[in-house]
Amino acid sequence: MDYKQLKQEFNTPFYIYNFDFIKERFLNLKEAFKARKSQIFYAVKANSNLSLLQMLANLDSGFDCVSIGEVKRALKAGAKAYKIIFSGVGKTKEELRQALEYDILYINLESEAEMMLLESVAKELNLKARISIRVNPNVDAKTHPYISTGLNENKFGVEIDIARKMYLYAKNSSFLEPVGVHFHIGSQLLDISPIHEAAAIVAKLVRELKALQIDLKFFDIGGGLGVAYEKNECEPDLYDYAQGILAQLHGLDLTIGMEPGRYLVAKSGEFVCSVLYEKQNKTKRFVVVDGAMNDLIRPSLYEAYHEIILPYNQGEESLCDVVGGICESGDFFAKARSLPSTQSDDIMVIKNTGAYGFSMSSNYNTRNKVCELALEEGQVRLIRQRENFEDQIALEEKFLKA
């Protein structure tokens, strides 16, 4: 990658995503489940750039959306409505109404209250809402507590007993059609045994429902496949992942749904920034760059590790903190990281930032959001232009008092 040329053409900081890498990951995951009917629903929240969504739609991907805005993004990018599912804990009445009007595949319900709200909306529209229920199997995903979602103490899904009652209610409703079951126990899982454990619990529920003449069509295993951010980490084997799921579904005629996000896009992305200067005090060396936590918040929010390289710098290394210009002590990309000495304008590359990078960015400190680039078949193109100050104030300026 010619970072100097990219910096000259687009300036820094910027994100760049390798679309060919994403395609390869997508096809490998699809291949792992070829023994059974399956559908990938890409988790839009991981990276919602329209060009990236369009590329996946062209591969016949489905999309897992957690807001009506994400549903609209997927449709705008060319997704088929019947390959979109709508998940998330806090769906509003208006979001549910629009989802039904778009005639998406199904809505993942997270509570009894949400089911009753959806039923009332469907009744108003004189439609039958296709539903799946997110079951919380109370399985420990053994991941960061902020991204663990499968325990009773987490806000997601409903317990097995409540789910059973919800399915029975939906079966007898004139405006609800139960078509699937869903679970997602957490994100960034390098040990996939908890997913297999959860699949066994939920498959048992499906068999119980079948005995009650509730025949579901979709068995949605969520996402959660982890990626190797650090060199000592190993990614899950896709064959083992798939076989562990398939083993739980013997005798059940179900389409497997899966919701990869991070797994598809994280390692495709790099956040490229420039060194502004170094700062040294009695105890610590700081490398100050033109990117900041508003661009990439994962290190600040989760203490997440990202490999950092200086592609054109060599020489003796020493420990340093890599920090941005935000007025927060939590504004850092790395702490106590061993890097060579730097000078103003040196290029720094922060690796594995294709997921939850730009999609979690903000305008904190009135900083402009960065541009995004795609690398595809050896060619680099702009897929989101850099924001400017006028973009930031466009929705406020007209309200200034004369």
UniProtKB/Swiss-Prot annotation:
The modification N6-(pyridoxal phosphate)lysine is found at K45. The active site is at C327. Substrate binds at R262, R298, Y302, E328, Y356. Its cofactor is pyridoxal 5'-phosphate. InterPro entries: Ala_racemase/Decarboxylase_C (IPR009006), DAP_deCOOHase_LysA (IPR002986), De-COase2_C (IPR022643), De-COase2_CS (IPR022657), De-COase2_N (IPR022644), Orn/DAP/Arg_de-COase (IPR000183), PLP-binding_barrel (IPR029066). One of its GO terms (molecular function) is diaminopimelate decarboxylase activity. Transmembrane segments: none annotated. One of its GO terms (biological process) is lysine biosynthetic process via diaminopimelate. Keywords: Amino-acid biosynthesis, Decarboxylase, Lyase, Lysine biosynthesis, Pyridoxal phosphate. Its EC number is 4.1.1.20. The keyword Lyase applies. SUPFAM superfamilies: Alanine racemase C-terminal domain-like (SSF50621), PLP-binding barrel (SSF51419). The keyword Lyase applies. It catalyses: meso-2,6-diaminopimelate + H(+) = L-lysine + CO2. Specifically catalyzes the decarboxylation of meso-diaminopimelate (meso-DAP) to L-lysine. This is Diaminopimelate decarboxylase. It comes from Campylobacter jejuni subsp. jejuni serotype O:2 (strain ATCC 700819 / NCTC 11168).
